UniProtKB/Swiss-Prot annotation:
Gene name linked to the record: mom-5
Keyword tags: Cell membrane, Developmental protein, Disulfide bond, Endosome, Glycoprotein, Membrane, Receptor, Signal, Transmembrane, Transmembrane helix, Wnt signaling pathway
The keyword Repeat is annotated on this UniProt entry: no
Pfam (any one): Fz
InterPro entries for the chain: Frizzled-4/Mom-5_7TM, Frizzled/SFRP, Frizzled/Smoothened_7TM, Frizzled_dom, Frizzled_dom_sf, GPCR_2-like_7TM
Protein's name in the database: Protein mom-5
Length: 570
């Protein structure tokens, strides 16, 4: 709040300063030659790569005492570090570098644009525009000028990386939009505006990640590790598919046995049957869905947006059924709560089933449409599927992480209340005299099964949410670090088509790449619940249900009439 007040005060001062400044950048041709260098005394401009300035400056201020209050108005922008170059840019305007040249050296247009791109969006939030007196078109492009300061950039990058890891705000928002020219030629896309890469320095539009695995400078994992991830996912998806199918068949064989409050497990199993099918299709399809050719070169890039119909279909199915599983988990906890705390019967809970279905299928459908409209679909090069938020931290947090956490939290509250009620019922039964041990034993078994299933669902789902948050916060740093190493390697500059100098390469945030165990746990946590559902239905009653179903089918088989047998014997 205090920061916002400071920024509002800054912008009010800026408006007044624009009216007071009558000397433009272009009027410096009449710059006086009777001048001398003086030591910088303006606090904001101390400890830069230069310590001597000259006046009048580029805005017409004749002394440092006059320029000091004017540049001090920008202190809030410096403090929030909206741009890595804002401090250097302002100082080269208000306290220009003193040299042996006749005129003071102006800041380069690139330096101005870097400062403007970082801070203009913040100014617009408060209803102000970038000051006309600092119009970047007034500054030179190729003449002698002050460019980016590498040490300043490094310090600012380190600050931004630390801020992102701590709070996850700048990483997830990524409001700064970089120039598309920063994207290497072989990663540049021509298929639409929905392609972009989230970097620590901002969002890089019209750009996508290469799909090819590389062992020299891998994007997180090399080819060998990617194969391990693909095999790992295939094994767990097959196991999840088999167990989910077994659960579905078990329910359908004797549906009356699984009334509410346990009926939602049927729909949970159906959701994970669909999720496992998506992963198996991704394994079989290799990179046909997650990757494609979207630029002017034959380089395969990660699919983003809804252009690839197959990719979009996989992503929607994966997202829809994952959100439905979260909703059915919440309904399962609610049904247990109604049965244990409010003493509702199975018929009373079943009467609410139309509302349960409307919520569990309707809300995910709305979210799935939103995902498509916002182009939040992209490919996962490690599994071959398409899903939400692999290269989009905002989508991963808003569409995946948040619903999972909300459903887990609400479900946990309902579950704890239900279990507490069962504990009270157990204490009450102990006071009875008829068949006490038998009743207590049945209740304890039910409590044990409910608690075990809740743990086997909650732990993997919570782990999945934690890994998603970890991925969303660190993905911009991983991408920027990978792009930095590609940019500075001479053999990669030509291979990828970097068109700007090495000095302009992205800074290395020095964030360690994730361990393979993180992504192994990510994929298993999305599939293991399907196996958990099968554990719930495994019992002696299940064997009895299958035996009865077999006998029922056998009794329907056609029998040979007796007189036909007699004829054949003759």
């Amino acid at each position: 709040m205090h920061r916002h007040i400071l920024i509002l005060f800054l912008f009010g001062c800026l408006s007044a300063d624009q009216r007071l400044s009558s000397t433009s950048i272009s009027s410096m041709n009449g710059f006086s030659t009777t001048r001398k260098c003086e030591h910088i005394t303006i606090p904001m401009c101390k400890n830069l790569d230069y310590n001597q300035t000259v006046f009048p400056n580029l805005l017409g201020h004749t002394t440092q005492s006059e320029a000091g209050p004017a540049i001090a108005q920008f202190n809030p922008l410096i403090k929030v570090k909206c741009s890595e170059d804002i401090r250097l840019f302002l100082c080269t305007v208000y306290a220009p570098v003193c040299t042996v040249l006749e005129k003071p050296i102006q800041p380069c247009r690139e330096l101005c644009l870097s400062a403007k791109n970082g801070c203009e969006s913040l100014m617009k939030k408060f209803g102000f525009q970038w000051p006309d007196q600092l119009d970047c078109n007034k500054f030179p492009v190729t003449d002698l000028c002050v460019g980016k300061n590498s040490s300043e950039s490094s310090n600012s990058k380190n600050y931004r990386s630390s801020n992102d890891v701590t709070f996850g705000v700048s990483t997830i928002a990524n409001e700064v939009v970089l120039s598309p020219k920063k994207c290497p030629h072989h990663m540049h896309t021509t298929s639409g505006s929905h392609f972009s890469l989230p970097l620590l320095s901002g969002r890089l539009p019209e750009c996508s990640l290469t799909c090819e695995a590389d062992n020299q400078v891998p994007m997180m994992f090399d080819g060998r590790v990617r194969r391990i991830l693909r095999i790992w996912t295939a094994a767990w998806s097959v196991a999840c598919f088999v167990c989910s199918l077994f659960t579905l068949v078990t329910f359908l064989v004797d549906l009356s046995r699984f009334a509410y409050p346990v009926r939602p497990i049927l729909y949970l199993a159906f959701c994970y049957l669909a999720i496992s099918t998506v992963y198996m299709i991704g394994v079989v399809g290799e990179d046909g869905f997650a990757c494609g050719t979207y630029g002017s070169t034959p380089t395969t890039l990660v699919t983003q947006g809804g252009e690839n119909v197959g990719c979009s279909a996989l992503a929607v199915v994966h997202y829809f059924f994952f959100m439905s599983s979260c909703a059915w988990w919440l309904v399962l906890c609610l049904a247990w709560f109604l049965a244990a705390n409010l003493k509702w019967g199975a018929e009373s809970i079943a009467a609410l089933s139309p509302y349960f279905h409307a919520m569990c299928w309707g809300v995910p459908a709305v979210l799935s449409v939103t995902v498509l409209v916002t182009n939040s679909v992209d490919g996962d090069v490690f599994t071959g599927i398409c899903s939400v938020g692999n290269l989009n931290p905002s989508a991963l947090v808003y569409f995946f992480f948040t619903p999972i956490v909300v459903s887990l939290a609400l479900g946990a509250v309902l579950l704890v209340c239900g279990i507490w009620s069962m504990i009270r019922i157990r204490s009450y039964i102990k006071l009875q005299h008829a068949d006490v041990e038998r009743n207590i034993s049945k209740l304890e078994k039910l409590m044990l099964r409910i608690g075990a299933f809740a743990i086997m669902y909650s732990l993997p789902t919570a782990m999945n949410a934690a890994i998603m948050w970890y991925q969303a916060v660190n993905m911009p740093a991983w991408l920027e670090g990978w792009l930095h190493h590609r940019c500075v390697r001479l053999q990669d500059r030509e291979l990828f088509g970097f068109t700007y100098p090495v000095d302009d390469c992205p800074m290395d945030p020095k964030v360690a790449a994730p361990e393979i165990i993180v992504f192994l746990l990510k994929y298993v946590s999305q599939l293991v619940v399907g196996i958990t559902c099968a554990i719930w239905v495994v019992s002696s009653k299940t064997l009895s249900s299958y035996h009865k179903a077999y006998l029922a089918l056998s009794s329907r088989s056609p029998t040979v009439p007796a007189h036909v047998d007699q004829v054949n014997m003759r």
